């Protein structure tokens, strides 16, 4: 009986921690999918005049704005998981559009051989069980998404 009273709380804490880790993995997957979709939409927003004239793929001049807008839209779908507004998180994200290639990304050091859109963001995700377990109630997730036309 004494052993049960001692071990039961430990098992409960372990179970709660495991469940919070699983929820965190789901939240991270949703945030990464939001960034991936935003860069994909921005890359697919091609300069139609250049495409008709030369047949080459060139990003639209507002590709960075499109990526930021769609990132905010997609984060809004996961707003219950976030510790902050989707618009605020998207506004703070580092969104870069490299309209011509080759280009060098000063943040990552990568060299892009095609026109590219990149989103790098720090997204705060709620982890209330960790907060109850004397850990952080908010976990910041770093997201990096890069897309280019093929």
What do these predicted regions represent?
Residues 41-116:
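Short amphipathic secondary-structure patches
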Residues 49, 110-114, 118-120, 125-150:
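Low-complexity, S/T/G/P-rich flexible repeat/linker segments used as non-globular hinges
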Residues 12, 27, 31, 96-106, ...:
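Structured catalytic/translocation cores of nucleotide/phosphate-coupled proteins
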Residues 1-69:
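Alpha-helical assembly-interface signal, strongest on the long, hydrophobic N-terminal helix that forms
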Residues 2-14, 18-21, 82-94, 118-131:
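Hydrophobic transmembrane alpha-helix bundles
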